[in-house]
UniProtKB/Swiss-Prot annotation:
Listed name of the protein: Leucine-rich repeat-containing protein 56
Compartments it resides in: Cell projection, Cilium
Sequence ranges assigned to domain LRRCT in this UniProt record: 207-250
Subunit structure: Interacts with IFT88.
Compositionally biased region (Basic and acidic residues): 416-426
Name of the encoding gene: LRRC56
Pathology linked to this chain's protein: Ciliary dyskinesia, primary, 39: A form of primary ciliary dyskinesia, a disorder characterized by abnormalities of motile cilia. Respiratory infections leading to chronic inflammation and bronchiectasis are recurrent, due to defects in the respiratory cilia. Some patients exhibit randomization of left-right body asymmetry and situs inversus. Primary ciliary dyskinesia associated with situs inversus is referred to as Kartagener syndrome. CILD39 inheritance is autosomal recessive.
Ranges of biased composition (kind: Low complexity): 522-532
Amino acid sequence: MDLGWDRSRGPRRSTSSVRVRELSWQGLHNPCPQSKGPGSQRDRLGEQLVEEYLSPARLQALARVDDLRLVRTLEMCVDTREGSLGNFGVHLPNLDQLKLNGSHLGSLRDLGTSLGHLQVLWLARCGLADLDGIASLPALKELYASYNNISDLSPLCLLEQLEVLDLEGNSVEDLGQVRYLQLCPRLAMLTLEGNLVCLQPAPGPTNKVPRGYNYRAEVRKLIPQLQVLDEVPAAHTGPPAPPRLSQDWLAVKEAIKKGNGLPPLDCPRGAPIRRLDPELSLPETQSRASRPWPFSLLVRGGPLPEGLLSEDLAPEDNTSSLTHGAGQVLCGNPTKGLRERRHQCQAREPPEQLPQHRPGDPAASTSTPEPDPADSSDFLALAGLRAWREHGVRPLPYRHPESQQEGAVAPWGPRRVPEEQVHQAEPKTPSSPPSLASEPSGTSSQHLVPSPPKHPRPRDSGSSSPRWSTDLQSRGRRLRVLGSWGPGLGDGVAAVPVLRALEVASRLSPRAQGCPGPKPAPDAAARPPRAAELSHPSPVPT
């Protein structure tokens, strides 16, 4: 028994002991861990770690080349919140140009420290707040960082090879920041348009801006080696632009910043992200293992990827401004405002979203009866229109009877002839009376005037309007007056088909009225002529 060991209390204090236990394991005491196969969780974790950065295999797959030394231009749209770029510059030794327009970069330090040979860098609309880390690009000659939130230009003083600098639409508001660019001896082209420094030399209220402030002349003094300023020769220091125009231009620059494809830094993690690459349109809520890598790589001379630019950056939102807050002040009755907004939304609806008539719809077929040419009033207009056009007489405006039921559809609505088309198709009547020609036959020498119907239509208040009957009577009187001018004109105007159609139209058929109708009047041609009908006016001397 070990003297330094007490079974009840464990090892005693102030005593040391060594216990050796013999193992019954016959194999190695420290065996190597065994793998469960290619689809194990460990392998998936390893693949995920490889996808976290731009590995050589990943770059080769994107560039579609086996030798990465052939890649001279790399264009990517990245989001460094999802994954690190790693030290990818080590695998691209001949990379000269790097395009990251529309990406989301927290800092330039995310690019790594292996791009010392890079000469051209595009960083437009990347959400950059500063240029910290740009000192790791000593060979940089051209920097395009427009539409960001850069206000500090001090890191640029370390770029001795810099020749072109584009800072359009940023937040430079102090001429003291422009002074740092004096340390760039080769700087020849500078763009500061869209910055607050164009309106005032220092931050502060606009009412304290020195009178006659000309920022072009001030920048020219600070950077004497400058040749081009805002795409205009730096030697041209003309009068400054009106303040109002410059402020409007600044508003346009801010709108361009907000139109970036990627959300700003303060975007919530659960919100979906719209990327410029169609392969990257997955929401952030998905797992990282199922997300594709947000890169698109181009070799010089290769085609641009499809869908590089977003088509719909700001879709229209029909929700109320009160939902998102920061809306206009609501004054007056809120119910009235909601009704007006509903009308505006309905007015903006495209025609394809409105309900359309379907031929097979049972509801529409039951509510709209089939038209019948025999008992429809439009048959009058279609039957007599040819006779009106042949003789060049302009008819009276055609009116449909008003429907008594609210919301009812006229049975002959689709076949209605517009008055404008009738007037355009008909030749104009001459102002002078037409010449009266002799009748070709004996029967046509007699001027026929229709007699009133023997069985007048019964008065029915629920079937038609009194205005319709008055209209027919006025047409009949007009035909009789025109017919009294002479046999020649009467033969054309008061033709038998037209008068017969007027006589039939003066009463409605049983199907139109919903009740048994009167018997039709005998034909005018079969009826023996009366004495009044055989008389015709005296001929007009020619």
